């Protein structure tokens, strides 16, 4: 997708040229386990764009040691992928939805049908036995809108947990000070 606020798509996001190799990820997970960490969160960019790499990372982490969760836009999370994530002991999947209005969500995400796929992804997560979280970015642009209230109602109605992320001027929104919540956004 081409989400309007993604750090990865920003000019400053171009600096990431190297990634941790599998050996380094395994070492990091082993150290986290030894130190008593119990959660492992995978996010950033879109993990499901490279499913082979994602499952290599999960194998290196050995998720059975942790409460394992990941965040996705849901575009590539179909029923088979949800089952595979559950088989790999992923406990929770957060799917980002920006509005219950399909057109608004798709505009923010930069791709048609992204809303439909995100909604379906949450159902696939729930059906696979993982904890579905509706991931909502909250900013001045939506804090007091009916769209925001509809998202919260939808999450409650479907028995999803809700994860609220406060918008900050970063990534493609680096200079967008108007996105930050202010005193009127309560």
How would you label these PLM feature ranges?
Residues 15, 96-98, 103-186:
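Radical SAM enzyme [4Fe-4S]-AdoMet core and its adjacent flexible, acidic
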Residues 1-92:
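Conserved alpha-helical substructure of the radical SAM core
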């Amino acid at each position: 997708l081409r989400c309007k606020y993604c750090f990865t798509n920003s000019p400053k996001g171009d600096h990431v040229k190297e990634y941790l190799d599998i050996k380094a990820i395994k070492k990091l997970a082993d150290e986290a386990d030894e130190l008593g960490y119990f959660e492992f969160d995978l996010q950033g960019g879109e993990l499901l764009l490279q499913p082979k790499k994602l499952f290599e990372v999960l194998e290196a982490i050995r998720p059975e040691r942790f409460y394992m969760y990941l965040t996705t836009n849901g575009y590539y999370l179909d029923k088979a992928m949800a089952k595979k994530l559950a088989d790999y002991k992923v406990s929770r999947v957060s799917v980002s939805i920006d509005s219950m209005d399909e057109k608004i969500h798709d505009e923010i995400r930069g791709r048609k049908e992204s809303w439909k796929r995100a909604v379906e992804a949450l159902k696939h997560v729930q059906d696979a036995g993982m904890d579905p979280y509706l991931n909502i970015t909250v900013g001045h642009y939506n804090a007091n809108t009916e769209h925001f209230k509809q998202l919260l109602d939808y999450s409650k109605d479907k028995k999803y947990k809700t994860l609220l992320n406060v918008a900050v001027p970063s990534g493609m929104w680096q200079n967008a000070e108007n996105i930050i919540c202010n005193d009127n956004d309560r």
